[in-house]
UniProtKB/Swiss-Prot annotation:
Consists of two distinct domains, a catalytic core and a N-terminal extension that is involved in tRNA binding. The keyword Aminoacyl-tRNA synthetase applies. This is Serine--tRNA ligase. The gene is serS. It comes from the Bacteria. Catalyzes the attachment of serine to tRNA(Ser). Is also able to aminoacylate tRNA(Sec) with serine, to form the misacylated tRNA L-seryl-tRNA(Sec), which will be further converted into selenocysteinyl-tRNA(Sec). InterPro entries: aa-tRNA-synt_IIb, aa-tRNA-synth_II, aa-tRNA-synth_II/BPL/LPL, Ser-tRNA-ligase_type_1, Ser-tRNA-synth_1_N, SerRS_1_N_sf, SerRS_core, tRNA-bd_arm.
Length: 426
């Protein structure tokens, strides 16, 4: 959420900055509500002052032996008027909050301007796509040929489209990928491994920015009077661990990682990526989250992005890093780098990680702060997150890049210890 003070004092400038995102802020509606809020606030204060004055006069009149019934009636009416004004004030504040909650984060000045993903800027390319001397198969055919290791038909029977059943060596390879990622992040990159709930409450989803705007992208449960949502990413529970907390400055940075399933309705995906693992309702991901001081967050973004890149390099998968343009940066982010891995069957790079600096946007929604050692005052934290990596898409990349002419799959060197020494599956 943006700073409420900025919305009151610098609304036109904020609206202008948001046009870079192709977001139109209704400044007239917000200004009108703000004027109404101020008028009601003045009215409320005047009623409060008058009631206090009249209440004091009751005691004085009683001491003089005067009839206080009219004064009591007046004070009672003032109380009713005050309650009505406070109700009106709450209604106006709720309307302002509804608008403010739907306003995306302001972009960092370094974000290139652009309309959509076509305007994203490539900043790095690593590895050379492999030249094949046989017809390349896609991961769907490759995975099924290994003992029906990728079984979309069974997934559809059990749940519906965009679900898969993995078995045998493919399931083991999927697990090995996640274990390798966790070990790298915890042993080499300094993250603490976490286990978190897969169901979260609305407050958590509001804190990281999924609610109220993106509720249709989530899977929700309704158990009597308890409502939960399945996590779309472990960014949600990990980041919300600091919600309503004041962290000691000496405990920063906080670096956490978790391997969880993620659940997404893919409400806006239409008919894209129906075939295969690229866009599933349920998929695994290893997430990285950093909680840092404001002045270190941009350096932390570079570090976080590098940690994701290292995973791809260890797996020897060609990739490129792109900086998202203003029209493609996500709702809560101030700056984002995407990593895209090479998929031979599609003859293109596809997103496998998104690494973002949220600035104070999520922290303000969560009231997540740290105590400044110099001032001894609480200040808003900065939050960052990134995929390190999407496990299913990494499996896709390995199957396609490591495929052999006979349909078998070579196992990347770094994964062989996790596969009991297997060098090839097929």
């Amino acid at each position: 959420m943006l700073d409420a003070k900025l919305l009151r004092t610098d609304l036109d400038n904020i609206a202008q900055q948001l046009t870079k995102r192709n977001f139109v802020l209704d400044t007239e509606a917000l200004s009108a509500l703000e004027e109404l809020r101020k008028a009601i606030q003045v009215k409320t204060q005047e009623l409060q002052n008058e009631r206090n004055t009249r209440s004091k006069s009751i005691g004085q009149a009683k001491a003089r032996g005067e009839d206080i019934a009219p004064l009591l009636a007046h004070v009672s009416q003032l109380g009713n008027d005050l309650d009505a004004a406070k109700t009106e004030q709450d209604e106006v504040l709720a309307k302002i909050d509804a608008i403010a909650s739907a306003i995306p984060n302001l972009l960092d000045d370094s974000v290139p301007e652009g309309k959509d993903e076509d305007d994203n800027v490539e900043v790095k390319r690593w590895g050379t796509p492999r030249e094949f001397d046989f017809e390349v198969k896609d991961h769907v055919d490759l995975g099924f040929s290994v003992d029906k290791g990728l079984d979309f038909e069974s997934g559809a029977k059990l749940a519906g489209t965009r679900f898969v059943v993995m078995r045998g060596k493919i399931a083991r390879l999927h697990r090995a990928i996640a274990q390798f990622m966790l070990d790298t992040h915890t042993e080499e990159h300094g993250y603490q491994e976490m286990y978190v709930p897969y169901l979260v409450n609305a407050a958590s989803l509001y804190g990281t920015g999924q609610l109220p705007k993106f509720g249709e992208d989530l899977f929700h449960t309704d158990l009597s009077n308890k409502k939960f949502s399945l996590i779309p990413t472990s960014e949600v529970p990990l980041t919300n661990l600091v919600r309503d907390e004041i962290v000691d400055e000496d405990d920063l940075p906080i670096k956490m990682t978790a391997h969880t399933p993620c659940f997404r309705s893919e409400a806006g995906s239409g008919g894209r990526d129906i075939r295969g693992l690229i866009r599933q309702h349920q998929f695994d991901k290893v997430e990285m989250v950093q909680i840092v001081k404001p002045e270190t967050s941009m350096t932390a973004l570079d570090e976080l992005t590098r940690h994701a890149e290292i995973i791809l390099e260890k797996l020897e998968l060609p990739y490129r890093t792109v900086q998202l343009c203003s029209g493609d940066v996500g709702f809560s982010a101030a700056k984002t780098f995407d990593l895209e891995v090479w998929l031979p069957a599609q003859d293109t790079y596809r997103e496998i990680s998104s690494c973002s600096n949220m600035g104070a946007f999520q922290a303000r929604r969560m009231q997540a702060r740290f105590r400044n050692n110099e001032t001894n005052k609480p200040e808003l934290l900065h939050t960052l997150n990134g995929s390190g990596l999407a496990v299913g898409r990494t499996l896709v990349a390995i199957l396609e890049n490591y495929q052999q002419a006979d349909g078998s799959i070579n196992v990347p060197t770094v994964l062989q210890p996790y596969m009991g020494g297997l060098t090839n599956i097929g």
